[in-house]
């Protein structure tokens, strides 16, 4: 069996581009292998900062291609169409034959059975694949026409011990590979795919990113264990540093303990995001220590690498401490007026205006959920005050977090301080939501104010663009409501928020604002339920029947129905509805014109008809108290109890009675029952109903 190997050697490619390109090139190669029906045993895509490698093992050396018929233009088409078809398939007029298929009479040609040399096939197809490879970010260099992630320097292409020769823009493939450092870079001849991997390994180049990741985790774990630190490295950072080195080596460094007075989040951001270092946390104290781990591309026998990293971190932390010492003395309350100088959005006023609207709306929400009104207004008033500080200007990712620490140092309560940091939450679909009542009020008010503003001036998200993160804001509101079990009328809050804009003399031009927003909320709510793997028929049954803006009640109802739908209670309720619905559908024309769900007891001629009506009225009375409908489990139980009565009803009573009045009256009874069921949820949406 044969082995194909391709290496694309370039200047260093950022880790994110490596991940995308590995996936893209795998898809393109697999598509081509499938197109030619080429079997193989193992397909691998590897990358290092400078290398992108495709390895396909267990290939045949030749490929037998059977003859096949190729459909051309319809018989009677212009001669140019037929000529183009023949040219594209390298055929002549004598090769053409006519054939009738479903869509009419067409010209066909039949290819010849042939045997392809796979080495030659790769020489043709690989340049096509490389040309179709797309990059999220790309560049041109020198005077070359090639667009690539980073300047491409060489192409190695082997089929067993033979070079697969092809040209790609200004480069020609070869059997040579670059090894050594940038300063001492040299080319080495490769005789086979097996030798390629061995030469790289001998040069401390681990081509397999999965193997490098294991090395990173193992070396981190060894240092954490030795220093009695928590062994829980950030896995995103692990993936990133894995793609930044050829041969990962973990090195431990330290910094001055004076910097430990800085907020932990600031230390984390400086080390992890800016320097790609792994902070270390003591197992004993559960606090961050003045040590860190960096992943190097080389061993550091002379301590030069770690010394350099320590100096860089010292400088960064010194800058952070300078801003911290400078800003922490600034009074948050006095900072609020400075928000007048920051525009929220050109048509929506300043951040000061936004803060005042958020304060009033949060105050209203505090009455609904029982939060401390005074503290809520204070928290909302200063929730954006840290945005005018140099520290947040330098570290914008820490907006809110910095405000929290300033608030604590200035004597505000922990609830107010937490609201400043937590009102931005959740930042993503898996982030925690605010749990304290004051933080909930400010978070809901801030997100609603943003939504009202942008929807109000017609800047709604499109299918491809959402520059103001409005989908995230909506999903955040829904999650805050559901996860904190809050029954809130969003429409009422939307109207209040709109009035606050109008009182600021900001024109809200969208006349259908509330309806548009609730529809947008419903769409995101459906997506949330889908992500939770809830049955779509259950979701549709509830949302079709309930145009509610109380998303916690809807969520409770959907999850309860989903829980009971496969239990005896749920199956009984569906079976009862289905049997009655089938009979009604058989008499659709009669029902459409004359049946409205109002049975006449005078026309009853059996006890079971009266019993069924009593039970239906009992359920209707239960439904007249809206709060009872929130107990979905009890409701399903009640609906399921009807089955015993309906079973007896269908056994003892002939619905399609010979007496037309009796028949219609029994249809009235069944329609009343179905309508009563549908008051809870639309049973017709259930699969099988």
Describe these PLM feature segments.
Residues 1-689:
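Amphipathic alpha-helical "coupling" segments that flank catalytic cores
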